[in-house]
Amino acid sequence: MKQLVVFTLGVLVSICNAAEHQPKTEVGVSVHKVGESFEVKASYLVPMDICNAFAFITDYEDARNIKGIAESKIISRTDNKVIVERKAKETVLLFPLEINTTLEYTEMPNRGLNFEQIHGDNKTYKGTWRLEPQGSSTKFVYQSVIEVNSMVPKTVLEYFMKNTIKKRFEAMAARATLKAHAPNPKCA
């Protein structure tokens, strides 16, 4: 029994040391309120080639693995246009917030994509993802304009946008870094 405890502690110490030495992806995020809308800009660099980066941002259904995204499913795909239904659930300072949206993505292989809400709870939601090769890594660059249509007080929404969005992008960057270790078969 004592050997099992010592072995388990050794494994836990090894895991903690490995996690400590894992390079942390730096994520830059800015959120600015402009009138009734929010402008969001974010970027992060991941040790992943451009093909795998594009496969990552176009894996729409994998978005369910990001905290706050309850559902994400492809409704249709035609050429470079993809329609995705997405449901996000958050609690913002004790206010439950659920946002349903249908997005149209226009893919530009290995360069990025544009997206726009075509139906949903937001008054406006549109933006872009751009991929910038940097050596053996790729920089993910996101920009969007969001005007939320909600009963949640505006000050609470502003708090959410400025304090929670960064965590969401950090989770995306961590997921991309994890996926970088298991390349997409389409890119082999």
Tell me the role of every PLM-derived stretch:
Residues M1-L4:
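Positively charged n-region of N-terminal signal peptides that target proteins for export
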Residues G10-N17:
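Hydrophobic h-region of N-terminal signal peptides that target proteins for export
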Residues A18-K81, K139:
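Hydrophobic ligand-binding cavity/cleft-lining segments
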Residues V34, L45, R64, G68, ...:
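Glycine-rich portal/gate segments that line the openings of hydrophobic small-molecule binding cavities
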Residues E39-K41, P96-T102, K123-T128:
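Short, surface-exposed coil-to-beta transition loops
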Residues N52-E61, F160-R168, M172:
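Short, well-ordered alpha-helical segments
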Residues N52-F54, A63, Y105, L131, ...:
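Hydrophobic pocket/interface hotspot
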Residues Q117-N163:
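Beta-strand/loop substructures that line and gate deep hydrophobic ligand-binding cavities in soluble
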